[in-house]
């Protein structure tokens, strides 16, 4: 059930990466 965590992490990571 780590899929959700991974997806959420990647989403947040991508958002921060794009925001920067």
Curated annotation (Swiss-Prot):
- Kindly report, in one word, the top-level EC class recorded for this enzyme: hydrolase
GO cellular component, alphabetical, reads:
lysosome
Where in or outside the cell it occurs: the entry states: Lysosome
EC numbers on record? 3.4.22.-
Q: Which GO terms describe its biological process?
A: proteolysis
Any GO molecular function: cysteine-type peptidase activity
Enumerate the UniProt keywords alphabetically: Hydrolase, Lysosome, Protease, Thiol protease
Q: Which family does it belong to?
A: Belongs to the peptidase C1 family.
Function comment = Thiol protease.
Protein's name in the database: Cathepsin L-like cysteine proteinase
Q: What is the lineage of its organism?
A: Eukaryota, Metazoa, Spiralia, Lophotrochozoa, Platyhelminthes
């Amino acid at each position: 059930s780590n899929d959700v965590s991974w997806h959420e992490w990647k989403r947040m990571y991508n958002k921060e990466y794009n925001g920067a």
